[in-house]
Amino acid sequence: MKIGFLLCSPEINGGTNVILEHGAGLQAYDHEVSIITERVVDPMEYAWHPKGDQLEWCTFAEAQEEQFDCLFATWWESPYLLHRFDAKQYIYFVQSIESRFFEEDDPTNMDLRDHSIGALRCDHSYFFSLPMITEATWIKQYLEKNCNQQPYLVRNGICKELYSGNSVLSEKPRQGLRVLIEGPVDVFHKNVPGTIALCREAGVKEIWLLTSSSVEGVEGVDRVFSKVPLEQTPPIYRSCHLLVKLSAVEGMFGPPLEMFHCGGTAIVYDVTGHDEYIEHEINGLVVEQDDEAQVVEYLKMLSANPDYLENLCKAAIRTADQWPDWHQSS
């Protein structure tokens, strides 16, 4: 089949990673796959992903000259664009309920004053009469309950071979915690600055930051890894005891699972999607949203109790071993 994925952005982010992995997976099954973007994309923009150069990239204008057997909308604006393209079947791949990504209206701020309009238009996209596929149980249930949809659930895989090594950038300190924080520093619902502050309050020995933001240094962070290619991330994960990921909104977030595959554990908020693989006090620690005092308490407890930390990590490895790879998912 000839399959196309409409893509919002080729930049480093979890959603784009999922789309490129599925595209490469379908191509491995001998389908012809195109990644379709509004503008011409420089290959350097997707060089962060090891499979980016295996796929055909084309613009909206070029794709409008083609006929597809199957065309995927992949973010909230793209269902409104499908009429521009010729396809036998259109599908909406829903990775989150994206209206939750919009900040509240602020009439005094030109950038924020009309966010509710975009959020409403986003919500309307989930009522389109399209077959839907999603990656998380909570999204499937939301679409069933609120939008009268019957989506298929296809959980994200993970690139097992990428995380199969044992190299590190630096051996973990024997005393105290080295914590990894992941996410863009300027996206409000990722809560990276707040996470850094809580780790500092807890007296964490070292804080590392893995970010898609173009930054050389961040206040309160000991070591910053900015725009790192995907294949270079495992040694970063393996060098840290745990990931602290305190997002306010997620679809089915990948970084804790990646940390599990690298021998670590995670502290997360009870954000949507966490329960796909994180079990409280078994393979990680789950904190009620915005309970900052509990986050600090858990960090202090793990620092003082390495045996408990080790037990969480061992269970996280067992969870990782049971998780499907991208070949199975695609």
Give the predicted meaning of each segment.
Residues D307-S330:
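A charged, aromatic-enriched C-terminal amphipathic alpha-helix characteristic of glycosyltransferases
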Residues A248-V249:
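Aromatic "clamp/platform" in nucleotide-sugar-dependent glycosyltransferases that forms part
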Residues A61, E98, D105-M132, K140, ...:
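Membrane-proximal helix-turn-helix segments that form the acceptor-binding/catalytic region
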Residues T265-V268:
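Short hydrophobic beta-strand element within catalytic cores of glycosyltransferases
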Residues P234, P256-H261, D275-E276, I282:
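Short alpha-helical segment that forms part of, or immediately flanks, the ligand-binding pocket
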Residues S99-D105, K145, Q150, G157-Q175, ...:
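Acidic anion/phosphate-binding donor-loop and adjacent secondary structure
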